[in-house]
Regions:
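Structural signal for hydrophobic
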Residues: 74, 114-115, 138
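Short Lys/Arg-enriched helix C-cap and helix-to-coil transition segments
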Residues: 110-119
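…primarily DNA-binding HTH/wHTH and HhH modules…
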Residues: 121-149
Length: 149
């Protein structure tokens, strides 16, 4: 794991077999700093500094096929834009609540931007540091805060 200090918290990034598998808050650097972890750290820092809008990293989502589909659709949401749980549910032909649960179980937040998925009636939840306030901070960083009004 490599840890990167940002205004959103200390983000810990893990890799396994050449792919990023996890991002956690309150991370600590442990083990070998592989070239992929170093690159992921550079990209997280560039994102936090406003110099990167789209991550270019190999990712591996460990989870059900449904979880992977939701993560793929979240990854397709551009920087500064949002979608609703209902939008994604409609794409997949499933209930919005199932999409919300999959968003909450996202193993690679920020890189897979679950913060860009909102409830139809407002923000919805956020499993990252700071809860909904953390989600708002990420959306403000991306210039999407006007969508919250």
């Amino acid at each position: 794991m490599i840890a990167v200090e940002t205004q959103f918290g200390c983000l810990g990034i893990e890799e396994e077999d050449g792919a990023i598998t996890s991002l956690v808050w309150d991370g600590h650097t442990t083990g070998e700093k592989t070239p992929l972890l170093i690159e992921a750290g550079l990209q997280i820092r560039a994102y936090a500094e406003g110099r990167l809008q789209k991550f270019d990293l190999p990712l591996r989502v460990v989870g059900s096929e449904f979880q992977k589909q939701v993560c793929d659709l979240m990854s397709a949401i551009p920087f500064g834009y949002t979608r609703t749980y209902g939008d994604i549910a409609q794409d997949l032909g499933c209930p919005a609540q199932a999409v919300g649960q999959a968003c909450g179980a996202n193993p690679i937040p920020v890189i897979i931007p679950c913060h860009r998925v909102l409830a139809a009636s407002g923000l919805g939840g956020f499993s990252g540091q700071g809860g909904v306030e953390g989600k708002v901070a990420l959306l403000r960083h991306e210039g999407a805060a006007s969508l919250l009004i």
